[in-house]
Amino acid sequence: LRMFGNVPSSRPTAWNSYLKSIKHIEIEEATLTGSFASYFRGTDFPVLESVRIEQCNLSGVTSFEMAFYNSGIEKVIIRDNDYPKAPSLLTATQYMFSLCRNLSELDLSGLDTSAVTNMYAMFQNCTSLEELDLSNFDTSSATNMYAMFSGCRSLEKLDVSNFDTSSVAHMQFMFEKCSILEELDLSNFDTSSVTNMSYMFQLCPALKSLYLDNFTDAAIMTGMFAGTTSLTYLFV
């Protein structure tokens, strides 16, 4: 399925008869407006394998909440997009890729997250994802990162080194069950606003090196390192 021109957030009813047979969606040189919450979810697109959103105007998108929730999708490319009406209107990405258990290729370099406040469980249980580069993510407005990467059990490399976390209050379960991740650099994290870090690194048995240079204690830190049995280098 190829889409271009003006793409509204409400899907045409005429699509309903063939949604269940669509495997690939390409949106190119289009203008997207409104809320795309649950737009590509697995219950509506049961055989969807890939989505590409490229060279589009995304400045009118307000939400990607649960956009790919529980999808069998394998590849998502969102890159080289334009935001001519700055600032971005996108405020919600919670559960965006949650339960995308087959997702193995993800490029979000063209997603403007500068206004996003809620990243709750954004990548939760992306169990096939091995690498995730979020070095270009603007998280300056984010307040909630609860369980953001929880259950990413195949993740070997995660780059969150440029995250601005100065407004984040919730980090509980953020990296829980990232079971083969060996190194994590959070030296740039500002945790001065964080109230809850409970179980943040729980059940990360392969984690050996953890950089927490700028961390400050939160009010709640219960079980923060529970199950981090290989932790050898902790830099604080």
Predicted regions and their residues:
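Structural signature of tandem-repeat unit edges
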Residues: 1-6, 19-32, 45-62, 71-91, ...
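Extracellular beta-strand-rich solenoid/capping regions of secreted or surface-exposed proteins
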Residues: 10-18, 29-41
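Small/polar residue-rich beta-strand/coil "junction" motifs that cap repeat-based extracellular fibers
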Residues: 14, 224-225
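Register-specific detector for alpha-helical tandem repeat solenoids, activating on a conserved position
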Residues: 37, 65-66, 94-95, 120-121, ...
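Short, well-ordered alpha-helices that flank and scaffold nucleotide-derived cofactor binding pockets
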Residues: 41, 66-69
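Acidic, Ser/Thr
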Residues: 41-43, 202, 226
